[in-house]
Amino acid sequence: MDVQPHFSLPTPIYPITLYKMIHLKEVKATIKPGVELVAVSKFHPAEVIQEAYDEGQRIFGESRAQELREKQATLPADIEWHFIGHLQPNKVKYIAPYISLIHAVDSLKLLNEINKQAAKHNRVINCLLELRVAQEATKYGMTPDECLALLESGEWRELKNVQIAGMMCMASNTDNRAQIRQEFQRARACFDEAKARFFANDPTFCQRSWGMSEDYDIAMEEGATLVRIGTAIFGEREY
């Protein structure tokens, strides 16, 4: 799918890094109040992340544990790192010391491992449950019914070093914006049911992570509190 940013891009007459930062400012101008921007920096070098940081961005999203580990060691300590990709249980130990939010928890097994590794560092790690609402077999995550069943089991309540803070999803890779909207609405309905049934008195269950470069405008209309934007900020990787 050819990703089109939601604004007209200027002719790239500036050095590549400065040109990218102009994208960051324009994207930020489109983010609604109450929504946080996760700048998806995966596959981009630390130098580009540093420039975005210098422009005021503090939340960055990565999807590979080793790559994140290397970047975290060299970049400012006050960056809020989010892990946004599929996370294998055996990789949790590499990010547990510093990760702020894990977006894509798709099983009780993974929750247990995050809890185990967080305890080693005397931390509570915030996590989002990943929903599979897209009509694509390649997407990870739980169906809404599977997600609610996990919560119904109550086993997660015994985990003292993880905090379930909300839900995450990815919409289908399609030009059909009505379909994308319906998928976000399914995710919001699941979130609302879980909130009412399991987290009614827990204000920390409040995050809805959906929307990327090509569909974040719809996501914000459908209740997103976090949008994960990479290409519209940094462009395609050219390194």
Predicted features, each with a name:
Residues 7-20:
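Short, Lys/Arg-enriched N-terminal segments with co-localized hydrophobic residues
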Residues 18-214, 222, 234:
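Conserved alpha/beta-domain cores
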